[in-house]
Swiss-Prot record:
GO cellular component: apoplast; chloroplast; chloroplast envelope; chloroplast nucleoid; chloroplast stroma; plasma membrane; plastid; stromule
Source domain of life: Eukaryota
UniProt name for this protein: Assimilatory sulfite reductase (ferredoxin), chloroplastic
Main localization (coarse): plastid
Positions of siroheme binding: 553
Catalytic activities: hydrogen sulfide + 6 oxidized [2Fe-2S]-[ferredoxin] + 3 H2O = sulfite + 6 reduced [2Fe-2S]-[ferredoxin] + 7 H(+)
Length: 642
């Protein structure tokens, strides 16, 4: 796994003097309580089973051989996955009970199916359980039929709202257990999926939501689709559970099938229904984003893998720069956990991208820690090993050397709000949605427009929505009806709101410590009032992100001003991100009560206005000044009239 979590002799990856990697035999797959499925490990090496195979028996992990007595223990989730018969048991039994909830093992497994069990934390008495469903939409693409289906499901089986997420998907809250199969099957039968939207596997693959008819944008979105297909589970557990085994999958591109099946460098589990994942899947969640030069709408460096299209002087895509090791989650006051930006690993030709991505995923699969989930993301493996060692190991699975990264221009955050020409005679319209929550008159009007004009939509990584393929003659009536529902053009939306994000937090998220989505409207109004008080112009802005806990779902550690839940009605304040999302923030103050935000922020905004350099953003200013000086400015601040 990692440098502190070793496989047994004969199965471990071994570094020789010249740093080559020897992928040895997987020995001794034995367990007193489980059965190994099949007769082969990685690369087709025979492995003796401890008992005869049985499709109904718990399954020994192909990728995790039985450990000797001295081996590091595995987390309980690893044991649950091992015994689940490829993410089926005991979820399949729990769904049939009369109880409104499922047991602990099933809670972990249903994540792989795209759902979290929740309850309303503000209700007293017994817990009223429900389930949140999350769709999987590579590049944020939502066909017209799927949007209308999700809109219907929210009203009939949810809480009457849809939520657009920071990974370009829908979240549907409030689904009762008894309705799960109906809702899931409806999504599947209407061009959607929730498979892998949660759980220890590749999540939704991001790409710019703009439907430009440009070679690099189209290629980025095609690549995102192909990576999503490559890393999608193959064992059928999802369709078995929700549509009785009926397959609703489109034909995969041949290059995806070829890359998945290729085992030239010992990446696959031979004869396993999960050739890439095995029975243990990945140690933790895994996130991928694809984009084009300059377009950082996807928060590229926060992903486990970031992929950037590189084109020649004629605009023809030639290959990709790849970044590895980003991730946001951390734990308060536990310095061994941290947010981290991805770093360059190299360049690959366009025909090799699926093989390179697969090699990176397999490196994490084989070496990521499985004993302590706090340290199981790939960022900790790379931080432990260093990028050079990580690259060496990946290259053994890739079968080639990475080329030097190509030089790229500066990044920009692109929101795609407002009207834009697609390049094919049609238009697209980006609409700001506060915290991604679509409800009320906004929801009703969006449905009417999308249904009337048969529009496909896309979800952005900033929780907004894009209406696609709009004819010129439709622009005026669509603009008018949207404005009447509060879906305004960007010139009428506060610049602070346009870049702000928040996670759902209370009342349904089990990890929330304090408010986020429900708290951010007031926070943004107070920041605007502070701007006015210190003399900052209306068109000036600061990237503000709010989360209810330190797990970082709204990527607060990239914000210029990040507020991270740190107790009831209090936040940890983070400063130092940049508007183009290329610099990570740092923790500035702990446990700042929400009613004390003016005491902290107003002096900083005031001195930023007075002391900033030309075009210096708030995040750049706070980094240049340093935290010691900033705290001094807060302590000595006597108001605007000083």
């Amino acid at each position: 796994m990692s440098s502190t979590f070793r496989a047994p002799a004969g199965a471990a990856t071994v570094f020789t003097a010249d740093q080559k990697i020897r992928l040895g035999r997987l020995d001794a797959l034995r367990s007193s309580h489980s059965v190994f499925l099949g007769r082969y490990g990685r690369g087709g090496v025979p492995v003796p089973p401890s008992a005869s195979s049985s499709s109904s028996s718990p399954i020994q992990a192909v990728s995790t051989p039985a450990k000797p007595e001295t081996a590091t223990k595995r987390s309980k989730v690893e044991i649950i996955k091992e015994k689940s018969n490829f993410i089926r048991y005991p979820l399949n039994e729990e769904l049939l009970t009369e109880a409104p909830n499922v047991n602990e093992s099933a809670v972990q497994l249903i994540k792989f199916h795209g759902s979290y069990q929740q309850y309303n934390r503000e209700e007293r008495g017994g817990r009223s359980y429900s389930f949140m469903l999350r769709t999987k939409n590579p590049s944020g693409k939502v066909p017209n039929q799927l949007y209308l289906t999700m809109d219907d499901l929210a009203d009939e089986f949810g809480i009457g709202t849809l939520r657009l997420t920071t990974r370009q998907t829908f979240q549907l809250h409030g689904v009762l257990k008894q309705n799960l199969k109906t809702v899931m099957s409806s999504i599947i039968k209407n061009m959607g999926s929730t498979l892998g939207a949660c759980g220890d596997l590749n999540r939704n693959v991001l790409a710019p939501a703009a439907p430009y008819v440009k070679k690099d944008y189209l290629f980025a979105q095609e690549t995102a689709d192909n990576i999503a297909a490559l890393l999608s589970p193959q064992s059928g557990f999802y369709y078995d559970m929700w549509v009785d085994g009926e397959q609703f999958m489109t034909a995969e591109p041949p290059e995806v099938v070829k890359a998945r099946n290729d085992n030239s460098h010992g990446t696959n589990f031979v004869d396993s229904p999960e050739p890439i994942y095995g029975t243990q899947f990945l140690p933790r969640k895994f996130k991928v984003a694809v984009t084009v030069p300059t377009d950082n709408s996807v928060d590229l460096l926060t992903n486990d893998i970031g992929v950037v299209v590189v084109s020649d002087e004629n605009g023809e895509p030639q290959g990709f720069n790849i970044y590895v090791g980003g991730g946001m989650g951390r734990t308060h006051r536990m310095e061994s956990t941290f947010a981290r930006l991805a770093e360059p690993i190299g360049y690959v030709p366009k025909e090799d991208i699926l093989y390179a991505v697969k090699a990176i995923v397999v490196t994490q699969r084989e070496h990521g820690r499985r004993d302590d989930r706090k340290y199981s993301r790939m960022k900790y493996l790379i931080s432990s090993w260093g990028i050079e060692k990580f690259r060496d190991v990946v290259e053994q699975y890739y079968g080639k050397k990475f080329e030097p990264s190509r030089e790229l221009p500066e990044w920009e955050f692109k929101s795609y709000l407002g009207w834009h020409e697609q390049g094919d005679g049609a238009w697209f319209c980006g609409l700001h949605v506060d915290s991604g929550r679509v409800g009320g008159i906004m929801k009703k009007t969006l449905r009417e427009v999308i249904e009337k004009y048969k529009i496909d939509v896309r979800i952005t990584p900033n929780q907004n929505i894009v209406l696609c393929d709009i004819k010129t003659e439709w622009k005026r009536p669509i603009t008018t009806v949207l404005a009447q529902a509060g879906l305004l053009q960007p010139e009428f939306v506060d610049p602070l709101n346009q870049t702000a994000m928040a996670c759902p937090a209370f009342p349904l998220c089990p990890l929330a410590i304090t408010e986020a989505e429900r708290g951010i409207p007031s926070i943004l109004k107070r920041v605007r009032a502070m701007f006015e008080k210190v003399g900052l112009d209306y068109d000036e802005s600061v990237v503000i992100r709010v989360t209810g806990c330190p797990n970082g779902c709204a990527r607060p550690y990239m914000a210029e001003l990040g507020l991270v839940g740190d107790g009831p009605n209090s936040y940890q304040v983070w400063l130092g991100g940049t508007p183009n999302l290329t610099q990570i923030a740092r923790s500035f103050m702990d446990k700042v009560k929400v009613h004390d935000l003016e005491k902290v922020c107003e002096p900083l905004f005031y001195h930023w206005k007075l002391e900033r350099q030309t075009k210096e953003s708030f995040g750049e200013y706070t980094t240049r000044m340093g935290f010691e000086k900033l705290k001094e400015l807060i302590d000595t601040y006597k108001g605007v009239s000083q």
